[in-house]
Curated annotation (Swiss-Prot):
Pfam name, any one: ubiquitin
Keywords: Cytoplasm, Isopeptide bond, Metal-binding, Nucleus, Ribonucleoprotein, Ribosomal protein, Ubl conjugation, Zinc, Zinc-finger
Gene: ubi::crp-6
Location in chain, cross-link Glycyl lysine isopeptide (Lys-Gly) (interchain with G-Cter in ubiquitin): K6, K11, K27, K29, K33, K48, K63
Cross-referenced SMART domains: Ribosomal_S27 (SM01402), UBQ (SM00213)
GO CC annotation: cytoplasm; nucleus; ribonucleoprotein complex; ribosome
Organism: Neurospora crassa (strain ATCC 24698 / 74-OR23-1A / CBS 708.71 / DSM 1257 / FGSC 987)
A GO molecular-function annotation: zinc ion binding
Covalent link location (Glycyl lysine isopeptide (Gly-Lys) (interchain with K-? in acceptor proteins)): G76
Extra remark: Ubiquitin is encoded by 3 different genes. Crp-79 is synthesized as a polyprotein with one copy of ubiquitin fused to ribosomal protein eL40. Crp-6/ubi-3 is a polyprotein with one copy of ubiquitin fused to ribosomal protein eS31. Ubi is a polyprotein containing 4 exact head to tail repeats of ubiquitin.
Name listed for the protein in its UniProt record: Ubiquitin-ribosomal protein eS31 fusion protein
InterPro entries: Ribosomal_eS31 (IPR002906), Ribosomal_eS31_euk-type_sf (IPR038582), Ribosomal_zn-bd (IPR011332), Ubiquitin-like_dom (IPR000626), Ubiquitin-like_domsf (IPR029071), Ubiquitin_CS (IPR019954), Ubiquitin_dom (IPR019956), Ubiquitin_ubiquitin-like (IPR050158)
Family: In the N-terminal section; belongs to the ubiquitin family. In the C-terminal section; belongs to the eukaryotic ribosomal protein eS31 family.
Length: 154
């Protein structure tokens, strides 16, 4: 039977094959006519790439069917250059951890009563456990930015 192979240039070549011929045999016949090595050939029929070990009848290729020939591309994408930074990276801030830091906020009297040294923020958005920073002339909440300023008595 006769089949057609459309090449990359748009030229159509005719091949005399049998339905029991393998795709390898067809590629060999294309090499004899066009000089393209079989390892670079990719044959496509009905949107599917034809595998080498299969026969023409496996893909239901009948007389006067047209196969499309495309070249196989090897390799992947272009290698990218690694970015070189001119300035060194900024060192991330490490928080200092102090053991038993809560002891700074409370004082125990001689009779066993606990006295709070720092004021807790009264704002509802902060919640319990948020203390205000004690400055010389003010108290400041770092979370909600509530500030109490003390007036100096003269």
């Amino acid at each position: 039977m006769q089949i057609f192979v459309k090449t990359l240039t748009g030229k159509t070549i005719t091949l005399e094959v049998e339905s029991s011929d393998t795709i390898d045999n067809v590629k060999q016949k294309i090499q004899d006519k066009e000089g393209i090595p079989p390892d670079q050939q990719r044959l496509i029929f009905a949107g599917k790439q034809l595998e080498d070990g299969r026969t023409l009848s496996d893909y239901n290729i009948q007389k006067e069917s047209t196969l499309h020939l495309v070249l196989r591309l090897r390799g992947g994408g272009k290698k990218r250059k690694k970015k070189v930074y001119t300035t060194p990276k900024k060192i991330k801030h490490k928080r200092k951890k102090t053991k038993l830091a809560v002891l700074k906020y409370y004082k125990v009297d001689s009779d066993g009563k606990i006295e709070r040294l720092r004021r807790e923020c009264p704002n509802e958005t902060c919640g319990a456990g948020v203390f205000m920073a004690a400055m010389q002339d003010r108290q400041y909440c770092g979370r909600c930015h509530l500030t109490y300023v003390f007036e100096k008595s003269s």
